[in-house]
Amino acid sequence: MTRRALVSVSDKTGLVPFARRLAALGVELLSTGGTQKALAEAGVPVVGVGDYTQAPEILGGRVKTLHPRVHGGILYRRGLASDEADVKARDIPPIDLVVVNLYPFREAVAAGKPFETCVEEIDIGGPTMVRSAAKNSAHVGVVVDPADYEKVAAELEATRTLSAATRFYLMKKAFAHTAAYDAAISEYLTAREAPEAAPAHFPATLAAVYTKAYDLRYGENPHQAGAFYRAAREPEEPSVAFADVLQGKELSYNNLLDLQAALAGVMEFDETACVIIKHNTPCGVSTGRTAGEAFARARECDPVSAFGGIVALNRPVDEATASELTSLFLECVIAPGYDAAARAALAVKKNLRLLEAPRLGAARATWRRRPEEGRELRSIPGGLLVMDRDLGSVRRDDCKVMTKRAPTEQEWKDLLFAWKVVKHVKSNAIVFAKDDRTVAIGGGQTSRVESVKTAVMKAALDVRGSSVGSDAFFPFADGVEEIIKAGATAIIQPGGSMRDAEVIAAADKAGIAMVATGMRHFRH
């Protein structure tokens, strides 16, 4: 039978109605601070923990519930003779229900509060009570989520106790709650540079907090279950995870991956730009005078692959752009915004998923990345791979001309465009670019020469006079020879092959230009 409950919550959602239901069952309520005040003002009978323990709060409220009469009442094992003797000798009544959620540490961090303020929001007594109750779940219920108030109150009203199954369910949630809380603290401290020394680039222990946003219909394939988890804090750069879904069917696992690929690609550009993604790799990229023109030009690179694709635009969508978008079957569109006319035009495509990421419309120079957002995580069975995200870029001055002929001004422009795109294509990656758009893309092949051949074979536009980006060096001259055969006139690549001399000789023989970046962009 539940006779006594300790209630101390920061999130007071649903608190008073829940407490009233407990009080109506004759449950004695113990409480502290703001929770006690809220209950008393609502007319709910409540006993202050200080009165209960005969030990007033000290240290400005830092010590309130850390007392044997509290933790003894929570932790003692009912029916165990030695425990029963201990609590009887010390006059420690049982506490059968603990209702606690923790100080808003994450909210303080998200609000950009000073370090000292965030430290004061690290809860001590709360997690201790939660862990005590969860450890003794054979006898004690612990509620950390207001969403469980109805379930707990209804069961107590029906049976005056909580079943073993319910207590185990609450135990799991309690330990997940405290684990996430501690991980958030660790993550915050890891990302913060200590005053006396810079932190290690990668911490010895990696803690991160992700909360399930929703279940997915399935994972990458229908036989795989899937779910989407969201980080505790919204990034300061554009984010698929925190974008607003304005219309369409629920997002799938593959949609989310492809949207991220599209977003990462379009974030390379300050100019009005569009990226079309299919199976996590670009099939068309272009800039334009308007968003609609950028989309139309990107689609022309590979109109077959663009069907059913994912589109990212870095400018708001107007009615003219919406008209272009509705001319092709698309899965998703992400943009900084949509005007009313565009929303009306796109609404006819009821299954089209529209996402809005307002920060995508801001200047790239205004985006800031917290240290943890500059990392990329991938799991393998039994382990986690962590690396810096590939945010590398090059300018013209960073490149070294490898050939006798230097690129023309137009070729330089096309080369740097191709280099922005090729880092987002699956390796081995080849991009033909001309006049601020891709004209052919080849990727995902196990040899570089085959990626060149694939790009040329698939090209819907004329590749003659284009410039080519390669995500890694050419191991042999054959890839360059195929590029020359296709009619391209300039190449940008990392350089560094053992056979660079042969590759350069092939380029010089044909009179094309080649530059080295010294930076590789493998994507697996």
From Swiss-Prot:
What EC identifiers does the entry list? 2.1.2.3, 3.5.4.10
Q: Which domain of life is it from?
A: Bacteria
Question: GO:BP terms for this protein?
Answer: 'de novo' IMP biosynthetic process
The Gene Ontology CC terms held by the record are:
cytosol
Please name the pathway. Answer: Purine metabolism; IMP biosynthesis via de novo pathway; 5-formamido-1-(5-phospho-D-ribosyl)imidazole-4-carboxamide from 5-amino-1-(5-phospho-D-ribosyl)imidazole-4-carboxamide (10-formyl THF route): step 1/1; Purine metabolism; IMP biosynthesis via de novo pathway; IMP from 5-formamido-1-(5-phospho-D-ribosyl)imidazole-4-carboxamide: step 1/1
Q: Which CDD domains match?
A: IMPCH
UniProt-recorded name of the protein? Bifunctional purine biosynthesis protein PurH
Q: What gene is this protein translated from?
A: purH
